[in-house]
Amino acid sequence: LHRLRFLLAPMVHWPEVMTAYEETEKILFSADAFGRFGSLERTARAPWVPQARRYYYNIIGKYGAQVQALLKKISALEIKTICPLHGPVLTEGLEECLRLYDLWSQWEPEESESILIAHASIHGNTAHAAKTLKGKLEKKGVQVNICDLTVTDLSYAVASAFYCGKLVLASSTYDGGLFPPMREFLEHLQTKGFRNRRVGLIEDGSWAPAAARLMRTKLEEMKDIHLYETVVSLRGALNQTNEAQMDALVAELCAE
């Protein structure tokens, strides 16, 4: 005998979402929750977390409050299997899956001291500055990820930004505005509810650098974003003044 119990889960991530719990075999049919990118044929044995993280933040991420509501509904259930609409059936490590969904849906970082440096460079000078900062931080023993927004699929960049507790944005100025890859990245972060992070800024612009001001304006529209005081402002290639600014930014990034 199989008995199904239906649990509404609106906006995870569609308005009409409903999950089902099969009481005999303890199976949760979770709809879009606990899904993962990747075809079963090619990624069946791949670790669940990286692609589940990317799926969560890019598909469900905006609806953290609704995910929290679903987690409360299923908290009293004994679950032996999770069957999502996307990705593999889950039969192992379910406690960790639930723990991560609780963390992700509260917009908390998995690694609070890790830093993502996301850069959008036109001719390479901004990218060089980003890589220089990475080297300085790694000498301090900091875990650093770096992402070139001009070539990286934004879904990976977004997932990495949420994974880390700190973010450094490095962008060239373009026609008096933000270089489009950085502008699009910030729009994606805002759409997915990016919050609770510490952020540093690097800008570049030969005549009138404006990227830092524009990035700050966009970040101030997000919740609980702490901006570091030091801004590295380049006018082309990295120089001694910028090196001093960068050392000050490194000190701030490592102080908390």
Identify the residue ranges that each predicted region occupies.
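Glycine-rich beta-alpha junction loops
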Residues: 33-35, 86-89, 122
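Catalytic core of the metallo-beta-lactamase
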Residues: 1-45
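Short, charged N-terminal beta->alpha structural module
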Residues: 118-140
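Short hydrophobic segments within beta-strands
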Residues: 30, 85, 118-120, 202
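FMN-binding flavodoxin-like domain, especially the glycine-rich phosphate-binding loop
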Residues: 40-82, 86-89, 132-147, 157-256
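Short gly/ser/thr-rich secondary-structure transition/capping motifs
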Residues: 9-10, 99, 147-152
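Conserved hydrophobic helix-helix packing surfaces used for dimerization/oligomerization
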Residues: 4, 27, 115-117, 199
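Short N-terminal or domain-adjacent regulatory/targeting segments
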Residues: 83-111
